[in-house]
């Protein structure tokens, strides 16, 4: 099921038009809605788990002269983000928004000791050493391409268009503890119309 179809089905089950988006829902209903005064009562935080984040942006030329995304996981990633946003009851926010994401990646075997325990973390490392493992994911894909695929996935679900995003932050890091590959995403309305 595509993200657009999932969105349409979601609104039809609720008796809303597909263009109404999720406007009728308050951010307080969504999982992880912010109430701390910093993110505001309408902010929503949700988790996407089940696959590694996929970059969007690089293209491959086809023999017939056409182009396609270099990463074949872009479409499934965008659909998973959209489905999780719907499940979290992310409202369709009007006006400018801020979007933040933490992208999580599965650690390779060299981040672990022989007994299977994670090596001590060192935030300044780029790659694993014999004694320590890095915290941050300093290898491809580029964070800007991950950000692009995730922002596009939330268009018409969390905001009308990703042009409404006026700020935010993105981090890439390796999973720690029982975390699974995916992302932790927060969308914050900044008011206005």
Describe the predicted segments one by one.
Residues 2-193:
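Acidic, proline/glycine-enriched N-terminal capping motif
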């Amino acid at each position: 099921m595509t993200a657009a179809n999932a969105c349409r089905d979601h609104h039809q089950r609720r008796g809303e038009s597909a263009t109404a988006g999720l406007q009728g829902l308050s951010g307080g209903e969504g999982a992880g809605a912010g109430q701390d005064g910093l993110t505001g009562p309408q902010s929503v935080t949700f988790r996407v788990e089940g696959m590694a984040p996929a970059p969007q942006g690089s293209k491959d030329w086809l023999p017939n002269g056409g182009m396609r995304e270099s990463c074949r996981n872009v479409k499934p990633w965008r659909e998973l983000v959209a489905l999780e946003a719907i499940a979290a009851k992310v409202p369709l926010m009007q006006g400018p928004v801020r979007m933040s994401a933490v992208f999580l990646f599965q650690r390779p075997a060299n981040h672990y000791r022989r007994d299977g325990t994670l090596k001590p973390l060192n935030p300044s490392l780029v790659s694993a050493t014999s004694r320590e493992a890095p915290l941050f994911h300093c290898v491809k894909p580029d964070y800007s391409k991950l950000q692009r695929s995730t922002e596009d996935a939330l268009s018409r679900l969390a905001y009308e268009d990703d042009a409404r995003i006026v700020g935010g932050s993105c981090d890439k890091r390796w999973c720690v503890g029982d975390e699974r590959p995916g992302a932790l995403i927060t969308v914050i309305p900044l008011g206005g119309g």
